[in-house]
Amino acid sequence: MAGGAVIENLSNRKLFVIFAGLLVIQIMFFLIGAWYAPSPSSYMEFEMITCRDETKGLSGEWIHRDNCQQISELSEYTPSSFDLREIVFIAKMPHTRDGIELEYSPWFQFLLGVLHVDVEYSEHFKYVAHAPLELEVRMGYRDKESKKNEWKELVTSNVTRILECTIAEDEKKAGGTYDCDMLDLFELGSSSYPFYLINIRIPINQQACQFDNKSANCQIGKLTGLRLIEIHQNGGFTLVWLWTKTFMTPVVAICLWWYYNRINQLARNPLLLERAILLLGLSLVILDFPIEWISLTYRIPFLLLISDLRQGLFYTVLFSFWLIFAGEHLIDDNTRNNLKSYRFNLSFIITASLGLLIYDLIERGIQLYDPFYSVWSSPTGSQIAYFAIFISAISTVAYFIFLFFKIARVWSTIKSKRSAQIYQTSENRRLKVEGVIYRFKFLMLFTLLCSAFTIAAYFMKQYGEAQLHGDEARDGFLTGSTSAFFTGAFGMCNIYVLLLLAMYAPSHKHYRGASQLIDENDDDEIMEDPSNQHTESNAMTTFLKPSTD
């Protein structure tokens, strides 16, 4: 049996069967998302009811539809004092439809709320660009066993958002309206309760505004109403997603254990490339593990944070592996199989990962106890977020420049050595080396395809989440029919890692304890080891290493 990895010793027929089977599985992942999974997210829109509270919130009483002294037209309402805290905007989530009280389900996984502010043009109450909007927000919840209006407090918070509005020239008249951007309001990392109630007060002291127009909410213009758009993950998508992860987790775990046993039974220490593949498989098992099943029974408010951390770990390991995968076929024997040789390139990945980790820990971490917090709501928080994202973006761009440079060098090295050496050898050896090169090229092309699809899926997910927080929340990428894209990307990542585990496992079926494997049926080795150090290595790596002649 020949030495090296499995990919170098399988027959073309077996490889074709394996690749054809993987292609069928990949198509199945796409079809599962296209046929069985609904769109990833859905939304509900609430026209917040305007109520009058004479106590101005001092009583601690929840204001809901049944005890609401409704204000029919806010623009015509005359308050009883200068303090406008007596005006309360309420929304009970979810809707009551056709007399049936709808419920939120743990299958929804998360709840996200964005706020739309209706501002009317007025010569007396003028809107000032970039006006800070201060809100006193109170969120309550109710269980199925509780009485209809028995609300328990979830969180109370004072939040500040920047109100960005524009108006056309022909709208600058009585009754004209501003076009205002959506505002982030809250984000819950789990859908733990079936019913929620929101009370919002906008603290405005009209007397203070007369003396200082920079007082709280004195520059927001003539506010006529609030609309709340709530977004959640579809339960049907969650079901398909969880069963897909549940099916793939043991498959990847078994393959990872098989791969570990293969490299552990060798008489040498694992190569750097083998250790990188092992770590990549482990990170995929962590990513695939369907911890979301637990959230269906128990309240896990930190589920979004865990999801982000798992995804960040996988992408960090995956990007590091791509560098090592390309680099191990280029560097010379003095530095090959040494992680220190990649410390410069890996520093870009570490920097980008740390930047995004800091941003995520601040945003998601604080939201664990204050879902109304947004890192973008304060100048200091915005600066930290922008700095972290900027450093991460620069590092990511630099990383991909190095990666594509290394891949280009690999292809160039293959071409030059192929023309210089292969055809000077025997026909049998030439055919073997041609097979090794062909299979390596295929895997490299599949790596490029997987990297492109993985990066596209990552950025499309980030773009979709940004849309959920902005003006395109109702028509965003994640609220469209994109389930096939995400299940397809998930399938490709798993297939790619499984292919690496299977194809790059040491091929030593009959020579488990040997330090060097030799083909008994061929005296002419595919790649001779001139140093005669008796270290089983990848044949492609041996072929591409610099000549010592």
Curated annotation (Swiss-Prot):
Main location: membrane
Membrane topology type: Multi-pass membrane protein
Lumenal topological segments: 36-236, 297-310, 367-383, 461-483
UniProt keyword list: Cell membrane, Developmental protein, Endosome, Golgi apparatus, Membrane, Signal, Transmembrane, Transmembrane helix, Wnt signaling pathway
Ranges facing Cytoplasmic side: 258-275, 332-345, 405-439, 505-549
Residue ranges, compositional bias (Polar residues): 530-549
GO terms (BP aspect): canonical Wnt signaling pathway; embryonic digestive tract morphogenesis; endodermal cell fate specification; establishment of mitotic spindle orientation; intracellular protein transport; left/right axis specification; mitochondrial unfolded protein response; positive regulation of Wnt protein secretion
Cited InterPro entries: WLS-like_TM, WLS_GOLD, Wntless
Segments passing through the bilayer: 237-257, 276-296, 311-331, 346-366, 384-404, 440-460, 484-504
Compartment(s) of residence: Cell membrane; Early endosome membrane; Golgi apparatus membrane; Basal cell membrane
Chain spans, region Disordered: 524-549
Signal peptide: 1-34
Gene null: resulting phenotype: Embryonic lethal with severely defective embryonic morphogenesis with no endoderm and excess mesoderm. In addition, embryos have defective mitotic spindle orientation in the 8-cell stage ABar blastomere.
GO molecular function: Wnt-protein binding
Entry annotated with the keyword RNA-binding: no
Pfam families assigned: WLS-like_TM, WLS_GOLD
Tissue note: Expressed in the tail hypodermis, stomatointestinal muscle, the mesoblast cell M and its descendants, CAN neurons, the developing vulva, the pharynx and the pharyngeal intestinal valve.
Gene Ontology CC entries for this record: basolateral plasma membrane; cell periphery; cytoplasmic vesicle; early endosome membrane; endomembrane system; endoplasmic reticulum membrane; Golgi apparatus; Golgi membrane
Function: Probable sorting receptor which regulates endocytosis and secretion of the wnt ligand egl-20. Recycling of mig-14 from the plasma membrane to the Golgi apparatus by the retromer complex is essential for its function. Its endosomal trafficking is regulated by its association with sorting nexin snx-3 on early endosomes and the mtm-6/mtm-9 myotubularin complex. Required in embryonic development for endoderm specification and the correct positioning and orientation of the mitotic spindles and division planes in blastomere cells.
PANTHER family in the record: INTEGRAL MEMBRANE PROTEIN GPR177, PROTEIN WNTLESS HOMOLOG
Family of this protein: Belongs to the wntless family.
Protein name: Protein wntless homolog
Species, as recorded: Caenorhabditis elegans
